[in-house]
Each structure stands twice: as structure tokens, then as C-alpha cells.
Design a protein with these regions (language model features):
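Short structured motifs
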Residues: 33-36, 80, 108-110
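Flexible inter-domain hinge/linker segments at boundaries of tandem extracellular adhesion modules
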Residues: 19-33, 67-72, 132, 138-151
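N-terminal Sec-dependent signal peptide, specifically the hydrophobic helical h-region
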Residues: 1-39
Length: 151
């Protein structure tokens, strides 16, 4: 009498299971990590959106992109080892700085200068290398400072 139950798969089922496992390994070469808490910003100030790869990996040859929602124009694009301002939304041109000093370790940031109230909301930090890609969702909360009137 056998003490442990054994699973037996047909040859085609075993091959399919192996292929699915390999596909999962290929597509999960890295994940993108961003802050879990909302990023707080004030109108007129600068704010920094940070994200990084896990495990740590050189991203110099990857595409890195920030955008507001899926399929929307980009807030910022880094591709082919350089910034691609021609793909950037007009309202962000000249107002962003790509911080890439740690890109060889998979860590990047985007500084948005002179934040406006309309920039409140969700941002996505997206990395792609070949067919592998992932994104982190960041939440930006923009507040306006109100000046108290003195009588």
C-alpha cells in the first residue's frame, strides 16, 4: 500500500505545464516597485516620483516611462539610452528632470517642477526590456496652500 498519493500527468499535459512554467519565469524577470504611500506635493513646488527594479538590475538599456493612465501620452520617456522629449506630453516639456544616477542599479526618479493642481492623481512608472515589462502605480496628492488673511 502506498503512503503518499502521486500525481500522474499525460505527456502532453506535462509538456504544457512545463511551457507555462517557463513562460511565467520569462515574463517575471523583474518587478517595478514604487512607494506604497501617496506622494504629497504642494502647488508651485517640485515633487519627485521614484521607482526601482526588484531584483536590482541595470536599466540603462531599458525603456523607462511615466504616464498618467494606460494608453495615455507620456509624462516622460527614456528609451535607447536617452530622453525622448518628442514622446512627452506638451504640458510636461521643460518641467521634468530624469534622475538616472542609479539607473545601473535599476533605480530612477522623475522630478516634476512647478506642480499644478491638475497633476493630482495616479502615475505609472513603467520599465520594459524586450518582452518583459512591469509597472508600479504611484499616487500623487497635490495640495494648495491657502494664505490666511490678516485683518
Amino acid at each position: 500500500m502506498e503512503s503518499a498519493a502521486a500525481l500522474h500527468f499525460s505527456r502532453p499535459a506535462s509538456l504544457l505545464l512545463l511551457l507555462l512554467s517557463l513562460c511565467a519565469l520569462v515574463s517575471a524577470q523583474f518587478i517595478v516597485v514604487g512607494p506604497t504611500d501617496p506622494i504629497l506635493a504642494t502647488v508651485g513646488e517640485n515633487t519627485t516620483l521614484r521607482c526601482h527594479l526588484s531584483p536590482e538590475k541595470n536599466a540603462e538599456d531599458m525603456e523607462v516611462r511615466w504616464f498618467r493612465s494606460q494608453f495615455s501620452p507620456a509624462v516622460f520617456v527614456y528609451k535607447g539610452g536617452r530622453e525622448r522629449t518628442e514622446e512627452q506630453m506638451e504640458e510636461y516639456r521643460g518641467r521634468t528632470t530624469f534622475v538616472s544616477k542609479d539607473i545601473s542599479r535599476g533605480s530612477v526618479a522623475l522630478v516634476i517642477h512647478n506642480i499644478t493642481a491638475q497633476e493630482n492623481g495616479t502615475y505609472r512608472c513603467y520599465f520594459q526590456e524586450g518582452r518583459s515589462y512591469d509597472e508600479a502605480i504611484l499616487h500623487l496628492v497635490v495640495a494648495e496652500l491657502l494664505e490666511a488673511e490678516v485683518y
